[in-house]
Amino acid sequence: MNKQDVTIYDVAREAKVSMATVSRVVNGNNNVRKETRDRVMEVIKRLHYQPNAVAQGLASKRTTTVGLIVPDLTNLYFAELSKGIDDIAVLYKYNIIISSVENRLMKEDAVIQGLLNKQVDGVIYMSNKLSEEAAEAFKRTDTPVVLAGTVSDNLEFPSVNIDYKKADTEALNLLLNDGKKKLALIVGDKEASINRNYRIPAFEKFVADNELEGCEIFDNIKDYSDGYNLYPELAKKGINGAIITKDVSSVGLLNSALDRGAKVPEDFEIITASATQIASVVRPALTTIKQPLYDLGAVAMRMLTKLMNDESLEDKHIILPYELIKKQSTLNK
């Protein structure tokens, strides 16, 4: 059966349930027994059924709508990325539907499917990590997808990023030149593709190439309190220089160091890798790997407009320039 021809009736017949039951399953209604829900979902996947949220008569027409998936609407990193996306969307007369997957009880693939059900013309996915659920959901659709500020492990989806290995290596060289030899890489999630495939290998290579000892990677540092509570452990281990991937955590780390009498940058240096506005308003101001967040979003949206118009991409994986902004949290020798 051609997947374009599959209807809710076909799913109901195959699953031996009513069309109303299929509708309840599709819409996430909990008033369906697990056994029945599982059977309906199996048929939906097998038949590649994609329910329409608009009239069937509009099925072949464009909605001029783009779906934007973000993990956290309050995170400045994603807010600045979104600004670039929105400006280009307005320029090309696209509307944006934003879906957040933060603190969702439903699975991420259900959030993605909810967007696809609205017949968006394309999707931009922003997250620190492309989950297996998201990747599988994107593979099941013909809707164009672009990743902004993240990558897939096998580079199967178009993306816009910076050269994370090069950026982190330059930052580590700055710390080493300042005399800091016990270094830390502090990340939110080791399994995030950017960390696992780029940042962590760059850190490990730098430590090995320079024969440094006592260096360490710290995981699961995601908010202010995580950063604040981490510093005593760093101090105990003699860590005197750190790259941290989340700005809000870097502020916690900075304040904790200062509260415990450490001199920044003389005793302890910090470089943050996100470079949102937070990094510039704290004192001492934080040295940052400045990512062009607005441009990352704008370029991702421009790529998506091409894909939605069946145009080819000259480069599926665009690397934008970064800048190491030296401020008061490093000696900058």
Swiss-Prot record:
Q: Residue ranges of the HTH lacI-type domain?
A: 6-60
The UniProt GO MF terms for this protein read: DNA-binding transcription factor activity; transcription cis-regulatory region binding
Q: Which Gene3D superfamilies match?
A: 3.40.50.2300, lambda repressor-like DNA-binding domains
Q: Read off the Pfam families from this record.
A: LacI, Peripla_BP_3
Q: Which SUPFAM superfamilies match?
A: lambda repressor-like DNA-binding domains, Periplasmic binding protein-like I
- DNA-binding region boundaries: 8-27
**Alphabetical UniProt keywords:** DNA-binding, Transcription, Transcription regulation
Q: Which InterPro entries match?
A: HTH_LacI, LacI/GalR-like_sensor, Lambda_DNA-bd_dom_sf, Peripla_BP_I
State the function annotated in the UniProt record: Transcriptional regulator of the pepQ gene for prolidase.
Name of protein: HTH-type transcriptional regulator pepR1
- Organism per entry: Lactobacillus delbrueckii subsp. lactis
